Amino acid sequence: MSLTTVKLLVLAPALALALAACNGDDVTGPTQAPENDDVAADVEAFCDDALGLGSPGEPEVDWETATEEEIAAAQQVFAEERLRPLVEDLRDSAPQDVQDDVATLEEALDEAEGSGDLEAFFGGAGGQARNAIAIEAADRCGWSSVDVTMVDYEFQGVPETLQAGPVVFSATNEGEESHEMIVFVKREGVEETWEEILGLEEAEVMERVEFVAATFAPAGEESTAAADLDPGEYVMVCFIPQGTDASGEEAGDGPPHFQEGMFADFTVE
């Protein structure tokens, strides 16, 4: 199997709301919600909108066969019809502390809608703005968190079981190579083991799983991913090829890391 990492990570920054504020034990439960009804309602709206930004879907395009022009056009539509409404919702619900960051995302979308390039939204100033919004969300929303260590070639600290609901995965890369964490859930009725599924061709794999979340961390760095998990059987996988440099900019020519054992399964109840 050789899933195209790039096409998954086009959306990873949106899925990887860098919730650096959620540190602590390997698994941390949700914090106390505000008691005041009005305050709770405001926080709930912000949390819903922040989580929506973390699960926006993807452009409608065949990544394998589309031309660069077709991909750009699809990303332009995605920016206009999907990302723009999400950011507009955040404009209404986000606290004052991150309103400047929402404005930065609006500017990034202006650029994306004009060019069909989502880099300004997913990276650079857009990425920093989303990080700030995510930190604010982590502080206010009380999502559970899971600390995961990535080494060459293993995920460490992954619990066997998690509770359903919003969860923040905080991934620290202590390896010599760059690593990613791509999270999938089995589709209903799938009975194969994760080892069997990951041994299939890409098209067959995607018939059996749904993409949930993704994040990437160069060697020595930390990144995070947030997702609203339903009950089911999950796995986190690293598809980066062996020999990729510490920054992730120069791809290696070896087998993907998961073939060296870098995948970990867990159950959500």
Question: Predicted segment positions?
Answer:
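Long amphipathic alpha-helical scaffold segments
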Residues: A103-L109, G116-T149
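Asparagine-centered strand-capping/turn motif at beta-strand->loop junctions
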Residues: A171-G175
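Bacterial N-terminal signal peptides that target proteins for export
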Residues: M1-V10
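C-terminal motif of bacterial Sec signal peptides marking the signal peptidase cleavage site
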Residues: A18-A21
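Long, amphipathic, charge-rich alpha-helical segments that form helical bundles/coiled-coils
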Residues: P85-F122, V235, A246
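Short, low-complexity, disordered segments immediately C-terminal to signal peptides
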Residues: N23-E44
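Alpha-helical segments in soluble extracytoplasmic regions
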Residues: A45, D49-A94
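Extracellular/periplasmic metallocenter environments
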Residues: S145-E154, L162-A164, E176, A213-E269
